[in-house]
Amino acid sequence: FELIEADIRDLDACRKAASGIDLIYHEAALGSVPRSIADPVTTTEVNIAGFVNMLWAGVQAGVRRFVYASSSSVYGGSRELPKVEAKTGEPLSPYAITKCVNELYAGNFHALYGIDAVGLRYFNVFGPRQNPNGAYAAVIPNFMAALLAHRSPVINGDGSNSRDFTYVANVIEANLLAGTVENPEALNTAYNIAAG
């Protein structure tokens, strides 16, 4: 294992990371809707150009498979339940747009260059060491912090909204399965990673 600390906007760094391997797990992104609204330019540079850099570096290095993080945000404001992979919605943020574009690039690179890709649409991931005080904290660590402090958790709205939460261990398992699946029909698509 070699840790490479670099910026995915740097194509040479991406080439170094892809050299000599046959599988890429691409999890790097600016992963926040509020941050994407505040800074759509940097979000686009990192999440789209950085994604393409990693994908292109993989193609050039002969990587056989590219497993990447997508997002439930590709469903936009769709109220349709359950969320079905083939029916995405209208993106509601710059972050969501970047994830939609990434899925298009993955399909395009498979068609043009033959690299297999699997997108994983994460739904509200939570787990150990998630910072409840961070600027972009998810609701689960906020609820846990409130309960541990003997306070009632804050619920915005009237409580009628629902969310699907996914434990981080399930996300890891989904990545490992996507990286090792042998059925060719399971490749070159995106999957919902959610508890349901």
Positions of predicted regions on the chain:
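Conserved Rossmann-like nucleotide-binding pocket used by diverse enzymes
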Residues: 4, 14, 44, 118, ...
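Active-site beta-alpha loop architecture of Rossmann-like, nucleotide-cofactor-dependent enzymes
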Residues: 9, 30-34
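N-terminal Rossmann-like NAD(P) cofactor-binding module of classical short-chain dehydrogenase/reductase
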Residues: 22-25, 67
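Alpha-helical substrate-binding/gating segment
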Residues: 125, 141-154, 163-191
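Conserved NAD(P)H cofactor-binding loop of Rossmann-fold oxidoreductase domains
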Residues: 27-31, 70
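Conserved Rossmann-fold cofactor-binding substructure of NAD(P)-dependent oxidoreductases
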Residues: 1-23
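Catalytic helix-loop patch of NAD(P)-dependent Rossmann-fold dehydrogenases
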Residues: 38-56, 60, 64-65, 74-119, ...
